[in-house]
């Protein structure tokens, strides 16, 4: 049986998306999404925030680079992936990221929302 690692995130960009075009001609964009959690231990205490790296490919990458900016709200549906590599000191390293399969851009000027599949 195949395992499922899908995730839905709704948050705000911490910076403008960075885009690269690979030798293969494919485009990849990356940005970090700040996702606020609703729970707080006290009214004075700020809520917890998670910072999640998002990776988009091809047309989604180009659209994100064109339409999304720091502070803008976005909803990402994607797959949770783990990058693994060996550091210069020989230690094994890893990090989690979300590879977006669908993204919704909220709050675009002149539009209520835009969905890119």
Curated annotation (Swiss-Prot):
Residues 1-107 form the SSB domain. The keyword DNA-binding applies. This is Single-stranded DNA-binding protein. CDD domains: SSB_OBF. Keywords: DNA-binding. GO terms for molecular function: enzyme activator activity; single-stranded DNA binding. Coiled coil: none annotated. GO terms for biological process: DNA replication. The keyword DNA-binding applies. It comes from Leptospira interrogans serogroup Icterohaemorrhagiae serovar Lai (strain 56601). Homotetramer. InterPro entries: NA-bd_OB-fold, Primosome_PriB/ssb, ssDNA-bd. Pfam families: SSB. PROSITE patterns: SSB. One of its GO terms (cellular component) is nucleoid.
């Amino acid at each position: 049986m195949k395992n499922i690692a899908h995730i839905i995130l709704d948050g705000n960009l911490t910076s403008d998306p960075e885009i690269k075009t690979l030798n293969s001609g494919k485009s990849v964009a990356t940005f970090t999404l700040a996702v606020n959690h609703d729970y707080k231990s006290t009214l004075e205490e700020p809520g917890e925030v998670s910072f999640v790296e998002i990776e988009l490919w091809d047309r989604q990458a180009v659209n994100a680079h064109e339409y999304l900016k720091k502070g803008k709200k976005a909803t990402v549906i994607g797959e949770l992936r783990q990058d693994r590599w060996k550091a210069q000191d020989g230690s094994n390293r890893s990090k989690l990221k979300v590879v977006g399969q669908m993204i919704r851009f909220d709050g675009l000027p002149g539009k209520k929302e835009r969905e890119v599949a």
